[in-house]
Design a protein with these regions (language model features):
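C-terminal peripheral helix-coil segments that are non-catalytic and often amphipathic
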Residues: 1-11, 15, 20, 154-155, ...
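Generic hydrophobic, amphipathic alpha-helix propensity
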Residues: 35-43, 60, 85-89, 93, ...
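Helix-turn-helix
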Residues: 38, 49-80, 84
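Amphipathic alpha-helical linker/stalk segments
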Residues: 88-112, 142-151, 160-166
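Hydrophobic alpha-helical connector segments
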Residues: 98-128, 172, 176-182, 229, ...
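Helical hydrophobic small-molecule/effector-binding pocket
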Residues: 112-133, 155, 183-190, 194, ...
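Short secondary-structure transition hinges
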Residues: 127-159, 177, 200-204
Length: 245
């Protein structure tokens, strides 16, 4: 496989000496195709450093250790680069949630497992998660790969809702509407967590259980005959207050 090297060469001066020669020690060698992945990682790193509003291709190149022109070999502008970061994030989210599905679980338990994996992904990847669903990417409809990856990740939930409808567990309604009802609940919880809403707040139980109960209650909204769920289960645990830090 052809090897591609990006060195911060800088502009050539009249005597032929490259202005970037002083940076040769920081040059990074990439096999063909790896530069693209390195730029995606560098993008997330710079978002953590300065925020998406101050993101620049020059800063991304600096973090990746390549020339300032290197990002343009793969992406025409910052927006296209952000769309690609989101695309990869949707792919990773699909893998994180779909691997939770198993025939040994009931449909409701599969939904609970995928929902927890969804929240875990958001907590582990707050910058990418906000990019996936936030307003930073312009003209989102122009990026077919990103849209397809997003649909695929959402279809993990839709497929389970369809199973529930076929089994007579869920309301016999549009699967997309029912799935969206569940997703908005889980997405809202994930967003509150990564925005710090639960930091230093006292909860009536360990946070993992707090989260599971919310997801379980949310799934009952689309069930035909949801099992009884009373507040006593929560009330009995009020002596185990913890903080989510």
């Amino acid at each position: 496989m052809q090897q591609m090297t990006d060195v911060s060469k800088g502009d050539q001066s009249k005597d032929g000496q490259g202005k970037g020669d002083q940076n040769k020690d920081s040059a990074v060698n990439y096999h063909h195709g790896n530069l693209r992945l390195a730029l995606l990682d560098a993008t997330v790193a710079q978002i953590k450093e300065v925020g998406v509003e101050k993101l620049s291709l020059r800063g991304i190149a600096r973090i990746a250790g390549v020339s300032q022109t290197a990002p343009y070999r793969h992406f025409k502008d910052k927006n296209e680069l952000l769309a690609e970061v989101a695309t990869q994030a949707f792919i990773d989210l699909y893998q994180a949630t779909s691997q939770q599905l198993t025939p040994q679980r009931t449909t409701c338990k599969n939904i609970e497992a995928t929902a927890l994996a969804y929240v875990d992904f958001a907590i582990a990847n707050p910058e990418r998660y906000k990019l996936m669903f936030g307003p930073s990417i312009q003209n989102r409809r122009s990026y077919s790969n990103m849209l397809a990856a997003g649909e695929r990740s959402f279809n993990v939930l839709i497929s389970q809702v369809e199973h529930g409808i076929e089994e007579g567990i869920f309301l016999n309604d549009c699967a997309m509407i029912l799935a969206n009802t569940l997703w908005t609940q889980v997405h809202g919880i994930a967003s509150l967590i990564i925005d710090g809403f639960y930091q230093n707040r006292e909860l009536p139980m360990p946070f993992d259980e707090f989260l599971r109960i919310q997801i379980s209650i949310a799934s009952r909204a689309i069930q035909i005959n949801p099992t009884a769920y009373t507040a006593s289960r929560i009330a009995n645990k009020t002596d185990r207050q913890v903080r989510f830090d």
